[in-house]
Regions:
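Phosphate/anion-contacting hairpin/loop surfaces
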Residues: 1-66, 71-78, 86
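Residues immediately within or flanking Cys/His clusters that coordinate Zn2+
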Residues: 61, 138-141, 161
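Short functional micro-motifs and their immediate structural scaffolds
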Residues: 72, 151-152
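RNA substrate-recognition surfaces in RNA-acting enzymes
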Residues: 80-89, 95
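Basic, amphipathic alpha-helical segments enriched in Lys/Arg and hydrophobic/aromatic residues
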Residues: 94-111
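Short Cys/His-rich Zn2+-coordinating modules
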Residues: 102-104, 121-132, 145-149
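Short, flexible, mixed-charge glycine/proline-rich loop motifs
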Residues: 131-140, 154-157
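Short cysteine-rich clusters marking metal-coordination/redox-active sites
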Residues: 144-147, 164-167
Length: 169
């Protein structure tokens, strides 16, 4: 049996031979645990899209594989950077903070089985409970867990972006 549950309608299934698979994988940037995902690579990748909002660049799979909407919001919250900032306006310290925030956010998400929205399930049928640990994602109009300021939601490149206007600059 093959089951494909694509709640958000972003997924696809392709049947590929080895060459086709290699072509598809070659379109992806490195995953964060790969040795080539260094701070230097990260800065170069982001600067290649300098006039783009940082949230959009973090979700660009050809630059960095594996960061989607939820984890870009959470990474930027941890780094204290607004999702609407242009890459060209970020300091080296802010870039370092974003880079250093990616792994802990994704590790926590993996530890909690990811995020289950509506009817999404893991392969074992269970639900991921990361959303209970999220600081900003899906928390618009609720108080920030850090400062109690109301979490806001905006749209960045067609995707929702959640942030704390006090904690993030």
């Amino acid at each position: 049996h093959l089951y494909f549950n694509d709640l958000r309608k972003f997924g696809w299934i392709k049947v590929l031979d080895e060459d086709g698979l290699e072509q598809e994988v070659s379109k992806l940037g490195p995953e964060i645990e790969w040795p080539e995902f260094t701070f230097e690579y990260f800065v170069k990748a982001l600067h290649s899209k300098a006039r783009t909002k940082v949230k959009t660049v973090l979700m660009e799979q050809s630059l960095i594989a594996g960061i989607g909407n939820i984890y870009s919001d959470e990474t930027l919250f941890k780094a204290k950077v607004l999702p609407t900032r242009l890459v060209k306006d970020l300091s080296e310290g802010e870039l370092r903070s974003i880079y250093d925030s990616i792994s802990p956010v994704l590790e926590l998400a993996i530890e909690h089985g990811g995020t289950s929205l509506k009817d999404y399930r893991r392969l074992d049928g269970g639900q991921g409970d990361y959303l209970h640990f999220a600081n900003v994602y899906h928390r618009a109009s609720q108080p920030c867990k850090v400062c109690k300021t109301t979490i806001e939601r905006t749209v960045v490149n067609g995707r929702s972006a959640h942030f704390c206007p006090n904690c993030q600059r």
